Amino acid sequence: ILAAGGPENIVCTVKEPTRETSAKMVNDPSVRMLVATGGPGVVKMLLSSGKKAIGAGAGNPPVVVDDTADIPKAAKDIIDGCTFDNNLPCIAEKECFVMKNVAYELIQNMLKNGAYLINAAQVKQLEDVVLVWSKPKKEGEQPKRVINKDWVGRDAKKILAQIGINVGDDIRCIICETEFSQAFVQTELMMPI
């Protein structure tokens, strides 16, 4: 940042962050804007601070790819992002919304970068492995699909093996074409799918 002419101390971090250090930063009069990710408590603290704030809890960040994109670069960047730490970080790419006229090219380039494309039947099989039904917390509440915590952060190779697909170590993530309402789009999986 300094080499590019930016100001000193524009980005700072706390060596050992705690709720107390977060509260100090939030309440410090010299801090004019806050940005944080975390659980609902952290986000609530930021948004109720009275300061400009950007807060995000659990996320399922989308990527939008249109026909102005450098498709080979977009594919590489998406795969690199969603496979970093097996897609655990809430900032990593979780799903792509792609214009039809570039979808085929994007998929082909994703395959070149370590993705494995599964079909609709395999998507259904995979749902039964990586998702479970929640137990309703209140009377009348409907169960919904939630992540199977046994598969959080697992390698794509191990996940695919559960549905009978054996791949090499070069496969870093699993991709599929699906509808917006499909559970993989609506649920933060925290695994390379």
Locate predicted features.
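Short acidic/glycine-rich loop or secondary-structure boundary segments that cap or lie
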Residues: 182-185
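ALDH superfamily catalytic-core signature
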Residues: 43-180
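Conserved glycine-rich beta-strand-loop-beta hairpin in the small C-terminal domain of fold type I
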Residues: 187-193
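Rossmann-like NAD(P) dinucleotide-binding subdomain of oxidoreductase/dehydrogenase enzymes
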Residues: 1-73
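Short, conserved catalytic or adaptor-binding loops enriched in Gly and charged residues
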Residues: 2-6, 164-168, 187
